[in-house]
């Protein structure tokens, strides 16, 4: 078996290790195209937090956008059945404007999305995977959880 660690750059190894981690926890790989219809992002501007999105008109006249976000593509393509949890991992490029120089950048993102009828187990698993993801990248990390419901639950359990 080939030792790919010798030929992969450190960021490529990290992506490979992260996707392997997510796969071991049962997350299905999600892959989408580089663009979506602009309307998806226009309806969800507050979620995206972007004031500018790269757009173009395709050959059939539809206004399209280079993806500024992966989550919305996953949500759009997920089943919405009651009682079902959709767990996806992804490694994809998004296109966002830089805060520093206001130019657009292609950014590689790797992560997970857990969508649907989510319970306590799913929330704990996502937090666990956040910790394991950070450990994969570096031993020097801080995990900041700012959801008040989770923080209250942790405080209640620790008290």
Task: Give residue spans per PLM region.
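TRNA-recognition modules of translation machinery and tRNA-sensing kinases, especially anticodon-binding
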Residues: 1-159
């Amino acid at each position: 078996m080939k030792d790919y660690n010798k030929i992969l750059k450190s960021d490529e190894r990290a992506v490979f290790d992260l996707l392997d981690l997510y796969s071991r926890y049962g997350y299905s790989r999600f892959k989408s195209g580089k663009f979506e219809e602009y309307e998806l992002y226009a309806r969800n501007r507050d979620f995206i937090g972007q004031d500018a999105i790269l757009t173009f008109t395709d050959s059939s006249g539809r206004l399209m956008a280079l993806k500024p976000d992966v989550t919305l593509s996953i949500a759009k393509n997920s089943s919405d059945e009651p009682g079902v949890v959709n767990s996806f991992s992804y490694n994809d490029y998004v296109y966002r404007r830089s805060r520093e120089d206001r130019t657009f950048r292609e950014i590689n993102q790797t992560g997970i999305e857990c969508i649907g009828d989510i319970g306590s187990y799913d929330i704990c698993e996502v937090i666990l995977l956040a910790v394991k993801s950070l450990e994969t990248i570096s031993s020097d990390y801080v995990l900041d959880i700012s959801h008040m419901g989770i923080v209250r639950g942790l405080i209640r359990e620790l008290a």
